[in-house]
């Protein structure tokens, strides 16, 4: 199973048994944290520094992939399309991927641009991270353009309001 934008490794936990785990992140510091996390929770993952725009794998390598809070960090529409096509390329026929992105419909972003630089505190300093805020229709369009069969698009499970438009995250399950 490929974990794109694996960060510090927490999203590996549900898959630590029964899967060969691969994790990619553009940040070598996050991969160091993922290595520590895998040791702490007693699982092995092959970790690599890589870019989602050019995945370092042959075609049809993975049965499964996840990308939790990764694609919304890609800055341009064209690059997001390239990244989704790359995901499709490395999935085996019939392979499935689960991904989450931030939702543009969150009330805190109603009057703001879909391109945001969000401040984060890191080791006592403020750093800014890029976020593209997706709409449900935009995500569906990009995934369809990449050639995926869309199995489901919905708010995160913890969201309970009747209008999905206001959820924090959009979740998608796709099949090649």
Model regions and ranges:
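Short, amphipathic alpha-helix enriched in basic
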Residues: 36-39, 63, 67
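Basic phosphate/pyrophosphate-binding loop/patch that engages nucleotide-derived ligands
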Residues: 89
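A short acidic, Gly/Pro-enriched loop at the edge of an enzyme's catalytic core
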Residues: 53-65
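Class I (Rossmann-like) S-adenosyl-L-methionine-dependent methyltransferase catalytic domain
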Residues: 1-3, 7-54, 78, 82-85, ...
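A short SAM/SAH-binding and catalytic strip from SAM-dependent methyltransferases
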Residues: 64-78
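Active-site acidic-Proline motif in GNAT/NAT acetyltransferases
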Residues: 28, 59, 72, 76
């Amino acid at each position: 199973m490929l974990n794109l934008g694996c960060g510090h490794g927490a999203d590996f936990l549900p898959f630590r048994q029964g899967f060969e785990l691969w994790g990619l992140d553009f940040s070598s510091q996050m991969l160091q944290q993922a290595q520590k996390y895998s040791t702490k929770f007693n699982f092995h993952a092959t970790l690599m520094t890589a870019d989602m725009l050019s995945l370092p794998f042959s075609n049809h390598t993975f049965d499964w992939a996840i990308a939790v809070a990764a694609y919304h960090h890609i800055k341009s529409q064209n690059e997001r399309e390239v990244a989704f096509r790359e995901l499709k390329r490395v999935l085996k026929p019939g392979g499935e991927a689960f991904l989450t992105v931030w939702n543009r419909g969150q009330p805190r972003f109603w009057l703001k641009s879909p391109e945001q630089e969000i401040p984060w505190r890191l080791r006592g300093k403020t750093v800014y991270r890029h976020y593209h805020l997706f709409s449900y229709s935009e995500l569906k369009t990009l995934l369809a353009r990449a050639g995926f069969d869309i199995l489901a698009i919905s708010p995160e499970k913890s969201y309970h309001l009747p209008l999905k438009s206001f959820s924090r995250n959009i979740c998608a399950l796709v099949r090649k």
